[in-house]
Amino acid sequence: MSTTTLTRREQRAKAQHFIDTLEGTAFPNSKRIYVTGSQHDIRVPMREIQLSPTLIGGSKDNPQFEENEAVPVYDTSGPYGDPEVAINVQQGLAKLRQPWIDARNDSEELDDRSSAYTRERLADDGLDDLRFTGLLTPKRAKAGHRVTQLHYARQGIVTPEMEFIAIRENMGRERIRSEVLRHQHPGMNFGARLPENITPEFVRDEVAAGRAIIPANINHPESEPMIIGRNFLVKVNANIGNSAVTSSIEEEVEKLVWSTRWGADTVMDLSTGRYIHETREWILRNSPVPIGTVPIYQALEKVNGIAEDLTWEAFRDTLLEQAEQGVDYFTIHAGVLLRYVPMTAKRLTGIVSRGGSIMAKWCLSHHKENFLFEHFREICEICAAYDVSLSLGDGLRPGSIQDANDEAQFSELHTLGELTKIAWEYDVQVMIEGPGHVPMHMIQRNMTEELESCHEAPFYTLGPLTTDIAPGYDHFTSGIGAAMIGWFGCAMLCYVTPKEHLGLPNKEDVKQGLITYKIAAHAADLAKGHPGAQIRDNAMSKARFEFRWEDQFNLALDPFTARAYHDETLPQESGKVAHFCSMCGPKFCSMKISQEVRDYAAAQTIEVGMADMSESFRAKGGEIYLKREEA
């Protein structure tokens, strides 16, 4: 852990330098590949890890090698992972999905922004230096049209986004020929449908059934299509965002790029500080992954942080503002009902969700029902016009082990199920947010209740944390719960960083949280038996047994840390080919001994075979040529 503390000015300067010098970068010994779909502009990015050959025999002067296949892996880094792409943050990313959106002919450009707040910001010349220069002209659905992926799925139409996703979810495993790499243990999937091969039609069917969502606002054409659902790979979300006391636009863009490099499938901008609108524009125009927000945070800023002063009109304006910028999914705390708030009085830690506490305070102050619940159909109408997915927030999630699985939590969950059905009436895609703090033996009930109450809509959880005693290590405490609930069927895991409960995460914290959660998600995929999930593990194990150190580093989720730890004790180049590491040394390496045992066993088999043949030869009279028996 770094002990160097930078001043605010130094942090901003460092982030600005990162942005100014940003270029497409591949991981060590990896290359970017593209798998093409049925039309030329469906080009699905993957990272292919190149491996060295295995020494199988020969002599020192004439060694014999056997090639090892490259291993393709899912890649969330977008253009930032392609060394051939010129990166310019000032201009933003290429608009990958724009031709697909235009071809559907179901949306139109707006003459002006629908949000009064957006119009005010654009008219403020004092913001010119902060503003992203290449602003898009926003689109919305034409009158009488719905533009959502759910709408098209229900019509039986496979969109280019769905085909892109099918290719992506298969992870290029059809390229693998080695039986060693293809071997996979059967999983326990708790009722999930995991086809051997994911087709565009399967993607369409899952979206149509509401079991999966494709967050893809028509005003975020830069994003690469991805899917969230329990019958697909488990996804990971990273949270970024400024606060009233720290961070800047430069730092948030840096964290966005950093998040996608380390595997974030989506990113939530949870900014609560200054210049929220401008920060979000920079993030969206440079994001290859879907962006989510919690609109109530910005709505609260618009009323000077006074929850009692919130109004539906201010919130509605915020939804329009963010939808026309391109936000792909909104967290809406519409399930925090007035009658549920007293249920939290007996809790140890009360209401820990920021959005939940804001709405609870508003309800009690006015003694009225939650205006998000009351206006939910209007929220759905807005989302349907831009294809903004809804992430129904768990405002009453437990904030401590003692409060897990209580009446308030599950009452809200049942209401979220009712709201899900309403959203589906408008062809709006929905996922459900979940806890929180839950001990291991109580986690599975959360998944079971969600599937039953919310009609199998995708579940999206924060951890859950499995113990409360480890501040500073809550990426571990929650990673345990995340792996478990991912196995049980959770579709997306919201990462937790080492700074959880302590402070705003920095760049290194983001990386640590993501690595922890990529481990949890992958462990869940293995346990479910997701087709192809074990390929990378098999490749790593083979490289480990064959002492191919460079391949071990490069197959790791974090090649740089793996190499650094190895080189702390064996930094010489000879250490990269040694048949041992510093843990056991040359004489006690179990894998080296195992290889020797295998070689010895093979030699013994040959000797036994020769002895058997010798005995057979003598038993037949010792003749070189045996007489042919007469018929």
Curated annotation (Swiss-Prot):
Residues annotated for substrate binding in this entry: 239, 268, 297, 333, 353-355, 394-397, 433, 460
UniProt entry tagged with the keyword Membrane: no
Pathway: Cofactor biosynthesis; thiamine diphosphate biosynthesis
Keywords from the named record: 4Fe-4S, Iron, Iron-sulfur, Lyase, Metal-binding, S-adenosyl-L-methionine, Thiamine biosynthesis, Zinc
Cofactor binding comment, as recorded: Binds 1 [4Fe-4S] cluster per subunit. The cluster is coordinated with 3 cysteines and an exchangeable S-adenosyl-L-methionine.
UniProt xrefs under Gene3D superfamilies: 6.10.250.620, Radical SAM ThiC family, central domain
Keyword Iron set for record: yes
Catalytic activity: 5-amino-1-(5-phospho-beta-D-ribosyl)imidazole + S-adenosyl-L-methionine = 4-amino-2-methyl-5-(phosphooxymethyl)pyrimidine + CO + 5'-deoxyadenosine + formate + L-methionine + 3 H(+)
Binding-site residues, [4Fe-4S] cluster: 581, 584, 589
Chain positions recorded as Zn(2+) binding sites: 437, 501
Domain of life from the UniProt record: Bacteria
MF-aspect GO terms: 4 iron, 4 sulfur cluster binding; carbon-carbon lyase activity; zinc ion binding
Subunit comment: Homodimer.
Functional summary from the UniProt entry: Catalyzes the synthesis of the hydroxymethylpyrimidine phosphate (HMP-P) moiety of thiamine from aminoimidazole ribotide (AIR) in a radical S-adenosyl-L-methionine (SAM)-dependent reaction.
Protein name as annotated: Phosphomethylpyrimidine synthase
This protein's encoding gene: thiC
